[in-house]
């Protein structure tokens, strides 16, 4: 399925499949405004009905324990109330606002609230055939369409699992859109190896996503790396040695000293993100660092991991080869799921087994090696091999493993004729014999992936070589995010 929405709206798409991953981030803040008839005497007669459905909505949402609710203090029936209540929710910092319709209401009230509140907006009509709530919602929706305010629509009893999931899907998507605004991406280096797909227009980023771009020279990594205390490096190397499956020093491209240099690079890059308050980064690496200092594979792995050699930490999105649209895609996935995100290439399609082979040139977060919050469970499946000297003269370790099996959502922001769109690809990582790793680049991390589409459709339609993945099914949320920010999308699925 595909969408071509710019200012037009699509109904909220709801998944009824059991989600394997759960939202683990801090509770999303959902604002709720309820609308009534603009005639005072009619409004007063409808207060009990409105309050009944509002109470049912609030109690049902509270039971999920996923949301912090900010409910308007009054049921809205005047323009003054609409403006004041919307502004109050905006000041409270809601991640999105639900417009609640149980009875007939004057539709201009919703427009006034939307003009003065904080979107994205979800219009909900409760299941109440005795009152024209659905009519009110559709009238309000039509008015919002006319003034160009994007919104989603949902109808039914909130006790219905589909409706409840629709509300949760909406607010999680809305929170991504709002939390992305005001963030800063650090571009460490510049465009890598002539890839247009990695370079961006800062004006376009700010206009569409609300994200700023801060440039940092790769020299910062090298200078800071040499200042990291030796004892810290030794402890980190010991920590890795005790936990990974193997560090293969059999080839000249990987030595203990080169491992230490990679560890230094990691700490230096982490220090840069903290000092400059960067929310996510892209590191060029190739060819300057990979030829003359050391590959940044270890940095990308452990920045994206929810832990490192010093313990648990927040995952910091890091895009390989300074792929900025890739890093932005990853940040969207991270904000949506609060989980590590993969960065890799579409390397090969196995026609005999109907498997796509996704691989990175040396680095992926180690979380995907075991899909565990315990680093030991993941790292026991990880081997550090020497990088390919043909491409990487400075050497260093690759972070090699096979992705643990499970349902995944793959995504990629791309541009066509300057216009952004998102590729959304539901899939599944599967386990195969370890010997299969040798069919491509055995020293690199790989994910063997089942997709429900024809290989030619994906290869002809995808907007670049890099894609990004998280465990779980988040197709509907990504579709909603695209609608909220006004970009096109295409879901590559045979279903």
Which residue ranges define each predicted feature?
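Ser/Thr/Gly-rich flexible loops in soluble cytosolic domains mediating phosphotransfer, phosphorylation
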Residues: 124-148, 314-332
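Metallocofactor- and cofactor-centric catalytic cores in central/energy metabolism, strongly enriched
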Residues: 23-138, 145-146, 155-174, 195, ...
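Conserved anion/nucleotide-ligand pocket segment
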Residues: 32, 172-204, 208, 354-372
């Amino acid at each position: 399925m595909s969408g071509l929405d710019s200012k037009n709206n699509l109904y909220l798409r709801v998944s009824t499949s059991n989600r394997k991953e759960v939202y683990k981030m801090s509770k999303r803040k959902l604002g709720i405004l309820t609308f009534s008839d603009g005639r005072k005497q009619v409004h007063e007669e409808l207060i009990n009905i409105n309050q009944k459905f509002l109470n049912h909505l609030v109690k049902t949402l509270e039971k999920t324990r996923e949301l912090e609710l900010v409910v308007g203090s009054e049921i809205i029936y005047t323009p003054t109330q609409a403006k004041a209540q919307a502004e109050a929710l905006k000041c409270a910092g809601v991640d999105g606002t639900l417009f609640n319709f149980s009875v007939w209401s004057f539709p201009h009230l919703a427009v006034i609230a939307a003009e003065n509140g904080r979107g994205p907006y979800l219009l909900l009509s409760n299941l109440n055939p005795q009152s024209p709530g659905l009519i009110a919602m559709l009238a309000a929706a039509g008015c919002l369409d006319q003034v160009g305010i994007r919104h989603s629509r949902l109808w039914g009893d909130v006790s219905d699992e589909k409706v409840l999931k629709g509300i949760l899907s909406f607010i999680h998507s809305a929170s991504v859109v709002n939390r992305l605004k005001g963030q800063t991406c650090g571009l460490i280096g510049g465009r890598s190896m002539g890839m247009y797909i990695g370079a961006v227009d800062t004006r376009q980023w700010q206009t569409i996503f609300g994200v700023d771009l801060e440039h940092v020279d790769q020299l910062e990594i090298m200078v800071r790396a040499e200042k990291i205390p030796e004892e810290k490096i030794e402890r980190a190397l010991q920590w890795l040695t005790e936990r990974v499956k193997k560090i293969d020093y059999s080839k000249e491209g990987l030595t203990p000293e080169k491992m230490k240099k990679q560890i230094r690079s990691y700490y230096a890059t982490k220090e840069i993100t903290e000092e400059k308050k960067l929310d996510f980064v892209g590191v060029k690496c190739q060819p300057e660092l990979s030829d003359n200092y050391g590959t940044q594979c270890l940095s990308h792995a452990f920045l994206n991991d929810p832990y490192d050699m010093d313990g648990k930490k927040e995952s910091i999105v890091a895009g390989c080869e300074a792929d900025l649209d890739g890093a932005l895609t990853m940040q969207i996935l991270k904000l949506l799921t609060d989980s590590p995100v993969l960065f890799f290439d579409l390397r090969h399609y196995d026609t005999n087994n109907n498997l796509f082979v996704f691989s990175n040139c040396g680095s992926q977060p180690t979380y995907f090696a075991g899909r565990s919050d315990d680093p030991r469970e993941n790292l026991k499946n990880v081997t550090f091999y020497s990088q390919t000297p043909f491409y990487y003269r400075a050497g260093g370790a690759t972070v090699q493993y096979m992705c643990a099996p499970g349902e995944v959502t793959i995504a990629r922001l791309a541009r066509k004729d300057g216009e952004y769109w998102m590729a959304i690809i539901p899939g599944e990582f599967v386990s195969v014999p370890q010997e299969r790793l040798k069919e491509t680049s055995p020293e690199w991390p790989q994910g063997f992936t089942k997709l429900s589409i024809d290989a030619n459709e994906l290869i002809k339609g995808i907007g670049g070589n890099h894609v990004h993945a998280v465990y779980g099914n988040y197709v509907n949320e990504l579709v909603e995010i695209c609608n909220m920010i006004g970009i096109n999308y295409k879901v590559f699925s045979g279903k």
